[in-house]
Amino acid sequence: MKKFVAFAGFALLSVGAFAQTNLQVFYDFGENRKHVTTTLEMFKSDDWGSTFFFVDYDYFNKDYRNEEVAGVKIHPNTYGARSSYFEIARSLNFWQESSLGALSAHIEFNGGVGFGSRNWLFGAEYFLHNDDFSNTFTFELLYKTFKGSESHLPLQFTFVWGMNNLLGVEGLKFSGFADIWGEDTYLWADRDKCESSLTFISEPQLWYNVGQFFNCPNLSAGGEVELSYNFAYNEGFMVNPCLGLKWDF
């Protein structure tokens, strides 16, 4: 799950229409993971707000090809995408030049293949930044609907941050997000509902623009750490480190 570029792009809202797209390729070193994930992100601003989406694909590895799905064994030569997940969001802001320009209305849809729940989210977001927009922070408060799962607390809190040229190092960027919401989810281990309805996920990322040294400023190397609690059918706290490359189009 990624949502970094959407809020980095707010820094350029004041100069008119702006678009940004990037592709990230990760190898996940987490326990029982050991697979490749690709993420395509796009952000575009306009006079009425902004649009953002991302698509994640997780790919088959050796262990996945030994699994059974609905009682059918997966062919050992199966390759390609194993599951996918996407989010698309629209921020509405007709008052960008007013004193409330940092506050936007927000509508979002989450879903995918291999994920039990699909969600519509409605609410508001608030954007903060320093003078040159090199450091940004966004907070969202959203009402969350559930299709395929249930919730006794249908709210989501989202925090997104971006820090460019971290510690004064040109090309070093620290970004990330954290989502907290209520959802009663089933666990793979025992198929019983989790006692806690709180779900948390955060993915801090660190990127360094290695391409600046060989006339290829689009290329960055780095990684992320997925920190989660009661997320994706897993009970308790999990840490999944990843290494990757990113290409900014």
For the regions a language model picked out, list residue spans one by one.
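Short loop/turn motifs that connect adjacent beta-strands in outer-membrane beta-barrel proteins
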Residues: A19-Q20, W48-F53, G80, N93-S104, ...
